[in-house]
From Swiss-Prot:
Source species taxonomy: Eukaryota, Viridiplantae, Streptophyta, Embryophyta, Tracheophyta
Subunit architecture: Interacts with TPL/TPR in an EAR-motif dependent manner. Interacts with TPR3. Interacts with MAX2 and TPR2. Interacts with D14. The interaction with D14 occurs in the presence of (2'R) stereoisomers of strigolactones, but not (2'S) stereoisomers.
Observed effect of gene inactivation: No visible phenotype. Suppresses max2 phenotypes associated with strigolactone-D14-regulated growth. Smxl6 and max2 double mutants have branching and inflorescence heights similar to max2 mutants.
PANTHER family: CHAPERONE PROTEIN CLPD, CHLOROPLASTIC, PROTEIN SMAX1-LIKE 6
Post-translational note: Ubiquitinated upon strigolactone treatment. Probable proteolytic target of SCF(MAX2)-mediated stigolactone signaling.
Clp R domain: residues covered: 8-190
Entry's family note: Belongs to the ClpA/ClpB family.
Name the record gives this protein: Protein SMAX1-LIKE 6
Tissues where the protein occurs: Detected in roots, seedlings and axillary branches. Expressed in the primary rosette buds and expanding leaves of adult rosettes, the vasculature of the hypocotyls, cotyledons, and mature roots, and in the midvein and petioles of young leaves.
Amino acid sequence: MPTPVTTARECLTEEAARALDDAVVVARRRSHAQTTSLHAVSALLAMPSSILREVCVSRAARSVPYSSRLQFRALELCVGVSLDRLPSSKSPATEEDPPVSNSLMAAIKRSQANQRRHPESYHLQQIHASNNGGGGCQTTVLKVELKYFILSILDDPIVNRVFGEAGFRSSEIKLDVLHPPVTQLSSRFSRGRCPPLFLCNLPNSDPNREFPFSGSSGFDENSRRIGEVLGRKDKKNPLLIGNCANEALKTFTDSINSGKLGFLQMDISGLSLISIEKEISEILADGSKNEEEIRMKVDDLGRTVEQSGSKSGIVLNLGELKVLTSEANAALEILVSKLSDLLKHESKQLSFIGCVSSNETYTKLIDRFPTIEKDWDLHVLPITASTKPSTQGVYPKSSLMGSFVPFGGFFSSTSNFRVPLSSTVNQTLSRCHLCNEKYLQEVAAVLKAGSSLSLADKCSEKLAPWLRAIETKEDKGITGSSKALDDANTSASQTAALQKKWDNICQSIHHTPAFPKLGFQSVSPQFPVQTEKSVRTPTSYLETPKLLNPPISKPKPMEDLTASVTNRTVSLPLSCVTTDFGLGVIYASKNQESKTTREKPMLVTLNSSLEHTYQKDFKSLREILSRKVAWQTEAVNAISQIICGCKTDSTRRNQASGIWLALLGPDKVGKKKVAMTLSEVFFGGKVNYICVDFGAEHCSLDDKFRGKTVVDYVTGELSRKPHSVVLLENVEKAEFPDQMRLSEAVSTGKIRDLHGRVISMKNVIVVVTSGIAKDNATDHVIKPVKFPEEQVLSARSWKLQIKLGDATKFGVNKRKYELETAQRAVKVQRSYLDLNLPVNETEFSPDHEAEDRDAWFDEFIEKVDGKVTFKPVDFDELAKNIQEKIGSHFERCFGSETHLELDKEVILQILAASWSSLSSGEEEGRTIVDQWMQTVLARSFAEAKQKYGSNPMLGVKLVASSSGLASGVELPAKVDVIW
């Protein structure tokens, strides 16, 4: 029985009750008999400042290739359509509110129970005594907060289905409601105080600009991000959003005006800036400006841009765009229109930049001007924190807010280590530029690692497989005992250790003078030194001596053993303090050496030459791939270069994202063979090989995909096998939800599972394939072929027969077959026509969907580490060789006068069997077909010759019988002879 609205309202807080009242208004306006969860969702989405609306907009904005505005509109449309399907009440409208449905009341009850189970909201639980004995709530009522009310509504199956139709996942929305993104959280600290900043929460920046030289560059991280947007070909007009957006814009404009342009790209290094924030405020102040006056001011701006002659362009600073969301004003509409015309006319030289302080302001701006994002070519750039360089030096004073961990400042831990570094340190270093770069990278990596996970987790779980070695028990003991050190002491000690390490390396390799003393105070050693780290890792081909240097068994001359420059950071353990006794490069002790020798470890050593290691790995990997995929020589070379380059390149955009490799063009079998070989080389076998096909029709019927998308299945497999090679076939056919998650994965190196949990892809090699070749993509068959790859891969196992008859009839059929084959070869691919769709959808929807997928695929493929285009396999030549071999066996039995006709299905079956055996690991794949011809086919030819003899009028035809169809591609053990 439905519950009265007044009774349900007593169970809610004031904010949640207002949301329920809005839902009741929606139900009454639509003449619905009851107020359901859908009405509540509709009301929450309509509220400008509701949590659900902000979360949905934020979630949609994470979809890179699509407009967040469009996806949010799709959600509103789906909710509206679902409400339209609900039956309307036939009774005349009354003053009573539509009662709360059983499902919505059950959601309120669930939210009460859920709120009781969360201790963090205990201090907010308000227990109110109620004297009325209403049937909806108990005498003691727990007021439900809006957040828990929304979470329970999202559990409703109908709401879940509606969100799914719009491309959202209720589980992800619930996760964002519980833990809002940073852009949402920042609003909590906007009133009079800034969010607390810990060192572990500072935004990541370029390693070369990080601690301990953060104050030396003078460039702001947000300014660098803005410069990257301005250097783009499209979407080059940044719109900064966030609490710190105004500050970031001011820092950027000050840098441009003062001539500090080092953070800009070379092609826009001469950028100039014009600020019109005051002019916009004056125009909109009283609204008295007419169209002519506004047009004259905008024309003056256009002339200024044309007369500047700046090759790098001009940026027009619009300032805070909140002024554009003011009350209706004719001058406002005219100004936006004229600025759009100016940008369209001067698009090559002119760029816009502006900021808004909150997502709510941005939403109001889009509501006011729906096309402004497209007209101004805006690129939304979230600014969640200030990135100004610290003015407190390298080691600020210890305090509660400055410690690495909360409450760390309560413990007295005065460091005995003073590092008087300043902005001029770079000029006083005696290391060469290359060694100094690597030193800075290792310092940045140490600090970044120390601020999140423990050493054991960081080293054992996060290192890529090719940088792992076996972790001895002694190492683990040292690591465990070091966790009680104060973080500031540890960081200072590591910095000094890294300085000495790279001093020794540079002195021994590049013969540079000794590093000048900077006045470090002596520190007594607390832990032994380790210059090589041993970590256990899965069995991998790259860990064998074939690809890496042999382990060090005894000390050798300094020139051979000095660890040289390595692009992928292998730093000292976080818990170790290096002690230099003046012996130069420090080696492991003999005791440790003997123990590791008994355990037979495979140490990952640093070669004295990075190029030597790269060449050795490259040649070994190329040799293995060439044996498996011998017909794709150029592609194999490119793949080996990309993978080995990623192993040794620290300049990659996201080193924590594993390796992403795109294989484009034809040869589906060759691509799959490459992925399988990589799993054998890097992870020890096919057990760590995950393969899915976005274009497969059987995915919806397979039990393992039931209730899941393709990416859901992949995340489940990666959670069980974190060290794997993932093959994603036909990635251009991915559905919209999978596209969003793949874009997030390639950008962040992390992929979300069904429940919103994040799975790291650092130790994963992702191979994405597509039949589209981006260099010469075409939908037409340029060269006519008789045996295209699609037909070979779709071949089936038929029962083969040898038919004998009149040669004249066979000849006629043969000529007809050849004619049809030639005609089919030159046909152009046609668009797919779905007869189940209405005419208007058939004409427009597929084209629009294809354009969206193409746009996403183009942007996604640019983010991978490397692209390799495969060449088509010449199946016609292989078929010709098969025909010649069959003809040779036939002539030995019947002679050259008897005519033989081969059915096309027979050629396809033999061709597919030969190709599958060649690509499934058989080095002598062709010998399998040759043996079958000798033992089976030739014997059947001899049997036919013995039964029916040989004469010129006899015709022989090798055909495929449809009665013997079998799954897979196999050659029959017997060929029947019939007349």
